[in-house]
Amino acid sequence: MKKLLLIAILLVSTTIQAQKSKVLEGDWKNLKGISAYNLEFEYENLEIPKYDSEEDFLKDKMAKREEKEPGAGERFKKAWFADREEHYEPKFAESFNKRWDDKEVVVGRDMASADYTMKIQTTFLYPGYNVGVMRQNSKVDAIISVYKNDAPDTILFSVKYTKAEGNAAFGNDYDSGVRVGEAYAKMAKTFAKELSKKAK
């Protein structure tokens, strides 16, 4: 048990260190005083390793599954898109919000009370894999941009995160949605920490 715990800690430490951020526009200080954000997620022109497009990725994965079991390909496609609302997006919001003990800053979908929007544009996604004896973390790159709802063309702040890696504790992430969801959680954690320190 101690060895498993040590491995889990090392995996988390490596994941946090591997993640990088680069400010693309504006300054962290532009976000000072903002207490609520409406979340918006975008997955257009998503890059997936070894494929020209997300469409090519889906065609390949669906065909391979369909050969083994009729109907499995369509189920894979349905799950692939469903994972966004079931895993990626709620994990991002949950991870971000729990970094603020007094709820000084909150994010969420369809927050009518929020005057600002936080847009998470995913640019790269590697789902990773877990086949028991072998596994690889998921990896996500995304651009987080903030703008006022009544001025969406005026970006107050934009930052790009690369190499946000996802894995569940003790390797319990055989489902790709769980692995990728953890990458979004780690990205949100890093963003919240930077926001807390730099938006002053």
Outline where the language-model segments fall.
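A structural "domain/chain start" motif
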Residues: 18-86, 90, 193-200
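Surface-exposed short loop/turn segments
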Residues: 21-22, 103-154, 166-174
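Outer-envelope beta-barrel architecture signal
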Residues: 4, 33-37, 114-116, 153-155
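Bacterial Sec-dependent N-terminal signal peptides
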Residues: 1-24
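Generic short beta-strand segments
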Residues: 41-46, 121-127, 161-162
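Surface-exposed helix-capping loop/turn segments at secondary-structure junctions
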Residues: 98-108, 195-200
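Short secondary-structure boundary motifs at beta->alpha junctions and helix caps
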Residues: 69-81, 151-197
